[in-house]
């Protein structure tokens, strides 16, 4: 039972809880910045006509099956 008590005490440590909330806020803030960023990876893929053409199968007629 001492192992279980030590684990519960470790999880309820105030310093760890405070660090966790700070990290979560910074991660949420960064994810919002990335959503609003036009140069993010998702936006660049959506706006890349060449990539979308290759994904849809157009423009690759020169490929031959071996």
UniProtKB/Swiss-Prot annotation:
Region feature Disordered, mapped onto this chain: 1-47
Skewed-composition ranges (Polar residues): 36-47
Composition bias type Low complexity, residue spans: 1-20
Name recorded for this polypeptide: Uncharacterized protein DDB_G0282585
């Amino acid at each position: 039972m001492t192992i279980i008590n030590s684990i519960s005490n470790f999880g309820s440590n105030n310093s760890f809880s405070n660090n966790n909330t700070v990290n979560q806020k910074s991660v949420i803030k960064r994810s919002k910045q990335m959503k609003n960023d036009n140069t993010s990876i998702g936006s660049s893929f959506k706006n890349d006509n060449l990539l979308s053409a290759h994904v849809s199968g157009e423009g690759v007629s020169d490929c031959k099956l071996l």
